[in-house]
Amino acid sequence: RSFNISALQSLFNEDVVNVVVPVTATVFKTLTDSTPITLLAAPGAGKALDIQQIILFVDAGSVAFNPSQDPDLAGPTTFTAIPKGSTVCASTTDVLYKVGLSASPVGILVQNAALTLTANAGTTTTGNGMLYFNITYKTVNTSSTMV
């Protein structure tokens, strides 16, 4: 019996990728629903992103962010909003927050969909910190063999 490299990597979860995506205060304050921030690019035709974990680090500045709505993660499946409360985005102290993925561990993965951050019809006008999204994911082929 023979195996290809991608099948072996998948078998032992060696195809899981971890990236850190920084979002500056300037970029975060320009966030709208019509101009989302791309955290992970769409993987291409015949592929889907399987988001396994997202941890948000808010490196707070001297002025807290003030999102008027909870920013949303959107893309490969339906995710939960990121709370804007005093413990996450609107904090003047550093915060490490594990985003609860509403589609995890089950959900329909959408083919060729990017992972984006949207404003959820809100605006952010103040803040001078940084956001860092630590994203753990794998790219899954959507063919019948899934490799």
Specify the residue positions occupied by each region the protein language model found:
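Surface-exposed, low-hydrophobicity beta-strand/loop segments enriched in small/polar/acidic residues
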Residues: 1-147
